[in-house]
């Protein structure tokens, strides 16, 4: 009888990175990375295409910091197009001179508060100079992406998103190594050969090679690692994230195809590990869902503020439009839907900028330990050790009463 257990597979908590001799200071590293061969990011972060994570407000906020947001598809074609247009037409408020005057139209913050001192107006105005790392296209517009899947109106949706000048599309599926996904990529690439496509989600080298062969520009890795995803327990399918990234990287190594690690990021150290395993960037849902900029509902529970966080495989999300992501488009009876996600809530965490500051800081620190001046260095030169449960326990604060 053949051995069906092919190998051991590991995730973030199963490994730790080995520090290397380094002349690199965290403050000296570059976080710039490639999303595709045509699109670069100034920070390796994407906001997830989830209806409680990314609409135009989130996409604008993350693009201003150097990343990119992916507008979810649980809305009409026209609504999704308008969300893209809000990002692409976003304008920074005009800079006010230090004396409070300007030859340009005054920003709303100034005209709405007539009694502010001029110096206060200057402090409150938003300046282009405040966002030197903003992710912009060749026309100096903020970049943004959008998700599509296998729906009856997918090609029509793509056409409208292209008209809105979307920068990149995500072919969004729970199982990217599907003949339907492969055929959809072929159709889109035939009609729009210069449109960059992210395809996923996948976890194997074979899937990567098949998607690359039909024109995928970037691959999204992750089946089941997300905090609100239940695919691994409902369907029994998935590969732990570190191993999945490593396997896909094996197919993409020495090519210009980039990798996004999607799901399972809880700490900044997980970002470092994901990139060290072979990812060029990470996609985040949970950590961004609690921010001010997410479109999710605010909830007060036991006197504390939370925001809703809903898996795209949950019943409610499927009803709103994500059935096709899980190949249940033909199922029109809610009672017959098989969910692969849950609904929950996460603590309100304030501005996205503050969350990104912590994630970037942890990544920069890790790069310093590993002697990696660039994201590429981190991918190529890093090595892991497998750790025990006791090692994991040792890695977290222990034997103290925490006061912060």
From Swiss-Prot:
One of the GO biological process terms: GMP biosynthetic process
Biological pathway: Purine metabolism; XMP biosynthesis via de novo pathway; XMP from IMP: step 1/1
Cofactor: K(+)
Keyword tags: GMP biosynthesis, Metal-binding, NAD, Oxidoreductase, Plasmid, Potassium, Purine biosynthesis
Binding sites annotated in the UniProt record for K(+): 224, 226, 229, 394-396
Binding site for IMP: 227, 262-264, 285-286, 309-313, 340
Top EC group: oxidoreductase
Cross-referenced SUPFAM superfamilies: Inosine monophosphate dehydrogenase (IMPDH) (SSF51412)
Regulation: Mycophenolic acid (MPA) is a non-competitive inhibitor that prevents formation of the closed enzyme conformation by binding to the same site as the amobile flap. In contrast, mizoribine monophosphate (MZP) is a competitive inhibitor that induces the closed conformation. MPA is a potent inhibitor of mammalian IMPDHs but a poor inhibitor of the bacterial enzymes. MZP is a more potent inhibitor of bacterial IMPDH.
A UniProt-annotated Pfam family: IMPDH
Residues that, per the record, bind NAD(+): 172, 222-224
Covalent S-S links between cysteines: none
Active site: 229 (thioimidate intermediate), 325 (proton acceptor)
Alphabetical list of SMART domains matching this protein: IMPDH
EC number of this enzyme: 1.1.1.205
A molecular function (GO) term: metal ion binding
Cleavable signal peptide: none
Listed PANTHER family: INOSINE-5'-MONOPHOSPHATE DEHYDROGENASE, INOSINE-5-MONOPHOSPHATE DEHYDROGENASE RELATED
Function: Catalyzes the conversion of inosine 5'-phosphate (IMP) to xanthosine 5'-phosphate (XMP), the first committed and rate-limiting step in the de novo synthesis of guanine nucleotides, and therefore plays an important role in the regulation of cell growth. Essential for mouse infection by tick bite and critical for the survival in environments that appear to lack sufficient amounts of guanine, guanosine, and/or deoxyguanosine to support spirochete growth, such as mammalian host tissues.
Quaternary context: Homotetramer.
Similarity field: Belongs to the IMPDH/GMPR family.
Protein name in the entry: Inosine-5'-monophosphate dehydrogenase
Source organism (scientific name): Borreliella burgdorferi (strain ATCC 35210 / DSM 4680 / CIP 102532 / B31) (Borrelia burgdorferi)
